[in-house]
């Protein structure tokens, strides 16, 4: 089984507001960069989307070391998700899980891989995290307001680049 390193990040301007996600996939010295964005989203949604897109980009089952600066992502996938599934996608206090459709997509995306989740401190000089952040900002850029108040966006309000 191939061993892949993935570094992900999400960014949002306004939270909610325009946002982007970025991911670096590294295998055997080769890197692939992915990024995309949405017109109206949150930072947490972009963090989840980065991980989903990165895992879905893998063409075969892999052993993955996924690095994120998001405690929300790491804690959710490493601990909370099993309880949410048992509770019908409700929290311990019976409220609907926020971003449930993304958590479900992430749960599905990770199934064919053996994923090790790693937390890194964001904006602390970690080179791959800084690059993933730059990719997330690039994904967000088309949706940020331009001078004159217009918002640049695609027809669907989201964009992905691979």
Swiss-Prot record:
Region Disordered: start-end pairs: 139-162
Predominant localisation class: cytoplasm
Protein name (database record): Ribonuclease H
Function of the molecule: Endonuclease that specifically degrades the RNA of RNA-DNA hybrids.
RNase H type-1 domain boundaries: 1-141
Any one Gene Ontology molecular-function term assigned to this protein's record: RNA-DNA hybrid ribonuclease activity
Cofactor: Mg(2+)
Annotated Gene Ontology cellular component terms: cytoplasm
Subunit text: Monomer.
Binding-site positions, Mg(2+) 2: 9, 133
Cited HAMAP family: RNase_H
Cofactor binding: number and manner: Binds 1 Mg(2+) ion per subunit. May bind a second metal ion at a regulatory site, or after substrate binding.
CDD domains for this protein: RNase_HI_prokaryote_like
E.C. numbers: 3.1.26.4
Enzyme class: hydrolase
Lineage top rank: taxon: Bacteria
InterPro entries xrefs: RNase_H (IPR050092), RNaseH-like_sf (IPR012337), RNaseH_domain (IPR002156), RNaseH_sf (IPR036397), RNaseHI (IPR022892)
Keyword terms: Cytoplasm, Endonuclease, Hydrolase, Magnesium, Metal-binding, Nuclease
GO biological process: DNA replication, removal of RNA primer
Binding-site positions, Mg(2+) 1: 9, 47, 69
Family indicated by similarity: Belongs to the RNase H family.
Catalysed reaction, written as an equation: Endonucleolytic cleavage to 5'-phosphomonoester
Pfam families: RNase_H (PF00075)
Disulfide bond entries: none
């Amino acid at each position: 089984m191939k061993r892949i390193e993935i570094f992900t990040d999400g960014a949002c301007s306004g939270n909610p507001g325009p946002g982007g996600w970025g991911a670096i996939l590294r295998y055997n010295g080769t890197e692939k960069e992915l990024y995309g964005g949405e017109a109206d989203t949150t930072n947490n949604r972009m963090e989840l989307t980065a991980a989903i897109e990165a895992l879905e980009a893998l063409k075969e089952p892999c052993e993955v070391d996924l690095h994120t600066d998001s405690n929300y992502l790491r804690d959710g996938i490493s601990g909370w998700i099993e309880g949410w599934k048992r509770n019908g996608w409700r929290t311990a206090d019976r409220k609907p899980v926020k971003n449930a459709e993304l958590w479900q997509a992430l749960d599905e995306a990770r199934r064919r891989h053996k994923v090790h989740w790693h937390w890194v401190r964001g904006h602390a000089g970690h080179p791959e995290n800084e690059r993933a952040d730059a990719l997330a900002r690039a994904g967000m850029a088309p949706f940020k307001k331009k001078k004159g108040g217009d918002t640049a966006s695609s027809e669907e309000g989201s964009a992905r680049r691979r």
